[in-house]
Amino acid sequence: MIVIAFDFGLKNIGVAVGENILKKGRALNKLSAKNGSPDWNNIKNLLKIWQPKFLVVGLPLNIDGTRQDITKKAEKFAFLLKYKFNIFVYLHDERLSTKEAKSLIFKKNGFKVLKKEKIHSVAAVIILESWFNQNLY
């Protein structure tokens, strides 16, 4: 079963695709956004190419589990995905995914490649793999 995950952001939205049997994700190109709103045609094309069974959207929360200002916008993004494309969307706790993504990129390639667009897509991989490991589908 193919699943696509999103690391929601106001300017960039990280994207990853994965398969539940392997429980592994692969980073795709990030999507540009304006105040959290992506080019919906780009998402439509992603869904057409990959034909996922589900979508997963990272839910940004504070370390103590409380909501952030961006939490509601991520929930709205998830709602719009479900509404526009008639596909089930899971919200998944993404606490520390960006920090973990930065650490992985830095360990692998050093500071020079620590670019924001890569961080979002690697964070989407972390969100997706975490979702695979915590769900029975």
Swiss-Prot record:
Its EC number is 3.1.-.-. GO terms for cellular component: cytosol. GO terms for biological process: rRNA 5'-end processing. It is an enzyme of class 3 (hydrolase). Transmembrane segments: none annotated. Keywords: Cytoplasm, Hydrolase, Nuclease, Ribosome biogenesis. GO terms for molecular function: nuclease activity. The keyword rRNA processing does not apply. It is found in: Cytoplasm. NCBIfam families: RNAse_H_YqgF. Could be a nuclease involved in processing of the 5'-end of pre-16S rRNA. Belongs to the YqgF nuclease family. This is Putative pre-16S rRNA nuclease. The gene is yqgF.
